[in-house]
Amino acid sequence: CNLTSGESLVRQFLYGKKFFREEFGQEHKILWLPDVFGYSAALPQIMEKCGIESFMTTKISWNEFNKIPFDSFWWEGIDGTRILTHFITARDYSNNGKQIQTGKEHTTERTTNYNGVIHPSQIKGAWQRYQQKELNKNVLVSYGYGDGGGGSTDWMVETALRLQKGNYGTPKVKLETAGEFFKRLHRTAREKEFPVWAGELYLEYHRGTYTSMAENKKANRKGEFALENTETWGTIAERYGNY
């Protein structure tokens, strides 16, 4: 989302939404990008004009120095467009506010995870980590083995079903779709004054987005320019010429 051209993003929305409409009869209104290394401030405008109403991400919590102060907020783009945004806050519960398990060097008290395992500690941790408790009483926890495949396991589903019946000391669990969650979040955002983040969503942890494999990225950009020029001149030729 940092390097991709605006036209490419528009086409991805166009064909992605077309696929869901034709194959599933659904109009997709959520941009779900858990594992992306930062977001251009142009994205809210593109989302809004492509019929996207909500945005979810996770990895932005990996920032090395500056913690983004919101988890549920309006993201404002360079033209003033605002998109309702939610960061997944799932992580294990901590008694001392420090983090916690996994053993990964980037793991801190800020780090969250979209590959949830839906056990009581993670449910408690998701609520503990959430920063807009005074405005919203619901958080989103996605579970299953992602970032390589596998999805939800039978024991994860069984654990989720048991937690839904209630577990002492654990926030109430409800199994539902992301669409249902965001509909409720939109209702809450209309009733409460959600905070606003204006501009780029910058990820500090992976800083080589623009510079690593620079020749590949330069070639990709040349290809994007060439495709746009080809389409433009092809359209003009079809409109005014005998082609």
Predicted regions and their residues:
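Catalytic-domain carbohydrate-binding cleft regions of carbohydrate-active enzymes
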Residues: 1-243
